[in-house]
């Protein structure tokens, strides 16, 4: 949501108001993430601000692409090394890089296509060439690739000098 740290003794509502963030949406997302839910409750849905939710998702994409994935790559290299002499480690890193590219394309697709579609819907315009099920098919492919990467590492990479770091990276 772009809320800065160091908000002191302010309540959630006060912080959200100061940061111009919809409080109900913030709380719904925070509860969603902290309880590992797979969907919002029926009671939460009418309270959600779709524009605030889209802003959150755009910020999450930026955080993931610019911070999380590069950090994971560094940790992966640190855990498995990455010399061309170690073919398995080199292939794992190449697979990771392909995965990152797919994630980047997926998030760009969401930012450009899905969010534009939702924004148009909010404005009362329906694009009959696009529907949300098209978007859903993109998500399952990314999840499958991540599981595949984890499977490859746990099944084929046996030479880790730092198993704790590799486990933490996974």
Model-derived features with residue positions:
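Small-residue-biased structural context
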Residues: 1-170
């Amino acid at each position: 949501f772009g809320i800065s740290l160091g908000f002191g003794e302010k309540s959630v509502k006060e912080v959200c108001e100061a940061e111009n963030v919809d409080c109900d949406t913030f709380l719904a997302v925070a509860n969603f993430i902290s309880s590992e839910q797979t969907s919002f409750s029926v009671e939460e849905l009418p309270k959600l601000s779709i524009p605030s939710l889209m802003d959150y998702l755009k910020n999450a994409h930026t955080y993931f692409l610019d911070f999380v994935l590069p950090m994971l790559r560094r940790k992966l290299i640190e855990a498995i090394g990455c010399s061309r002499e170690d073919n398995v480690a080199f292939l794992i890193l190449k697979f990771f890089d392909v995965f990152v590219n797919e994630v980047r394309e997926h998030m760009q697709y969401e930012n450009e296509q899905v969010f534009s579609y939702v924004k148009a819907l909010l404005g009362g315009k329906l694009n009959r060439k696009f529907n949300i099920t098209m978007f859903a098919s993109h998500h399952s492919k990314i999840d499958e690739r991540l599981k595949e990467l984890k499977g490859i590492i746990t099944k084929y990479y046996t030479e880790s000098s730092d198993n704790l770091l590799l486990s933490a990276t996974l």
